[in-house]
Amino acid sequence: MATYLDFESKIEKIQHEIVSAHAIANLEAVEKYQKELEKEIEKTFGSLSDYQKLQLARHPDRPYSLDYIKLLMDDAYEIHGDRAFRDDPAILCYIGWIGGQKTMLIGEQKGRGVKNKIKRNFGMPNPEGYRKALRAVRLAEKFDIPVLMLIDTPGAYPGLGAEERGQSEAIARNLFEFSATKVPMISIVIGEGGSGGALAIGVADKLAMLRYSVFAVISPEGCSAILWNDPSKVETATKALKITPSDLLEHKLVDDVLDEPLIGAHRDKVTTAEAIKTYFLESVKALRELSLDEMLDQRYKRLTAVGAYSEK
C-alpha cells in the first residue's frame, strides 16, 4: 500500500476516488479524476519547500541502494567484511555488470522493517563499513574497474564502539585514498547525504544528486537543536542549511542533478534506476577518454575547489 506524506493528502484522496470509480467500472469518473490528479500533482510538486524535499528524501518507500543493485546489476557478487574486524551490513559492496560495463558498486543501506533497520543500523555505517568500502575500491583499482557509489545515510554511526575502532580515521582514510584511486569514481546521492557518513564514499570524479535528495553537514533537527534549542525550527533550519540539489549545484558543491519522476523515485524505481545507469555509463565513457594523469588532475582540482569563494 502506498505511503503518502502530509502535503500529499489531496493526491491521496483523488487516488482513492479513482480506485472507487474503477471498482464500479465508472470510466467517465475515472477519466475525470485522472485529470484532477495530474493537475494536483503539478500544483503540489511544482512548489515544494526545502523541508518537503527533505521528507521525500527520507520517504519510507524511497528506493535504497539494494533496490538499485537489483535493478541495475547483472551477475552481481557481494563482497563481505573489512578483513580486520567484521562485516558491516550498513555498507554494501557488489561487483557485477551495469549495461555491459564491469562495475564495483558501493552503497549505504538503511533497511526496511524493524528487524532489517536494526540489522543495517538504520543506514549508519561503522568504521568497518568504510574500511570494507576501501577494500572494494582497492580491488576495483587492481582490476581497472570503475566505481559507482550510492550515498544514503543520516550519518556515520556515532556510538562509543565506532569511535574506539577509529570512525574518524576510517572516514579520513577513504577521503585520502579515494582522491588518488586510479579508476573512474562516480558518486550519487540517492536519498540522505549526512555529513562525514556521506563524504566517506563521496570523494569522486563526479558527484551527482537525485532531484529529491539532500546533502548536509548536519541534520536539520540537529541544527535546530543547536542553534535555536527549539525542535520546531526544523523547517527554518532546512532552508538555512541549503541542502537541496539546486542549492548545492549553485554553490558548485555537486556536478549534476539527476531527474527522477515528479512524484518521487518511490513511484517509479525503474525510471530512476535508468537515469542512474545512463549517468554512470556516460560519465565513465567521458573519463576513459582522458589519460590517467588528466583524470586524476581533474579530480584533484574539483576537490580542492570545494569551499573556495571570493569576497566582493
Curated annotation (Swiss-Prot):
Pathway: Lipid metabolism; malonyl-CoA biosynthesis; malonyl-CoA from acetyl-CoA: step 1/1
Domain of life according to the entry: Bacteria
E.C. no: 2.1.3.15
UniProt-annotated location(s): Cytoplasm
InterPro entries to which the protein is assigned, alphabetical: Acetyl_CoA_COase_a_su (IPR001095), ClpP/crotonase-like_dom_sf (IPR029045), COA_CT_C (IPR011763)
Coiled-coil segments on the chain, per record: none
Domain spans labelled CoA carboxyltransferase C-terminal: 36-286
Catalyzed reactions per annotation: N(6)-carboxybiotinyl-L-lysyl-[protein] + acetyl-CoA = N(6)-biotinyl-L-lysyl-[protein] + malonyl-CoA
Key words of the record: ATP-binding, Cytoplasm, Fatty acid biosynthesis, Fatty acid metabolism, Lipid biosynthesis, Lipid metabolism, Nucleotide-binding, Transferase
UniProt-listed SUPFAM superfamilies: ClpP/crotonase
Gene3D superfamilies: 2-enoyl-CoA Hydratase, Chain A, domain 1
Any one GO BP annotation for this protein: malonyl-CoA biosynthetic process
GO MF, one annotated term: carboxyl- or carbamoyltransferase activity
Broad class of where this protein is predominantly found: cytoplasm
Single GO cellular component term: acetyl-CoA carboxylase complex
Uppermost EC category: transferase
Function per UniProt: Component of the acetyl coenzyme A carboxylase (ACC) complex. First, biotin carboxylase catalyzes the carboxylation of biotin on its carrier protein (BCCP) and then the CO(2) group is transferred by the carboxyltransferase to acetyl-CoA to form malonyl-CoA.
Assembly description: Acetyl-CoA carboxylase is a heterohexamer composed of biotin carboxyl carrier protein (AccB), biotin carboxylase (AccC) and two subunits each of ACCase subunit alpha (AccA) and ACCase subunit beta (AccD).
Family recorded in the similarity comment: Belongs to the AccA family.
HAMAP family, per the entry: AcetylCoA_CT_alpha (MF_00823)
Protein known as: Acetyl-coenzyme A carboxylase carboxyl transferase subunit alpha
The organism of origin for this protein: Sulfurovum sp. (strain NBC37-1)
Lineage: Bacteria, Pseudomonadati, Campylobacterota, Epsilonproteobacteria, Campylobacterales
Gene label: accA
